[in-house]
Amino acid sequence: KIQFIPKGLVVPKEGLASTWSERHVAHVAGHGTFGLSDGLITSKGIAHRCGSVVTDAAFKPSARAYSSPFEYCLFKSEGSCGRCIERCPCGAIGPDGHDKEKCRQYMFVAQLDWTKKPGYIGNYSGCGLCQTKVPCEARIPRRGRAIAEPAVVGLKARD
């Protein structure tokens, strides 16, 4: 049974957050595979937000376009690329994956001074550089062309 969000729903001051990984739900639902930075690479790329709907409605499972949880990541699947490693300002991404604690320290501790600047809204600043100017930014990257192919039209290969 599908229930709609009530008209009188009040969003708490601290926002809404799920107690599960939206990226993992999207992966299990067949929407993409994981990258070296732990982001989900979909047909529209890695630079996105995920959300899910909890329901008891019956759906027919869709076929998966991939067989490995890291198939769309050029570094994990063929040892090429690694652009997200280069893009990370705090060294939280390396050949072995994403150091979530190092990333968290950068986002929530090192950047706290940014929140005091005029016009800043919120209590922390996200980073997301590992999801921009990379071959998987806006699509599933083409194999064997990780460095030669810019992530977005108009960017140089090593921007």
Predicted regions and their residues:
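Catalytic cores of enzyme domains
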Residues: 1-158
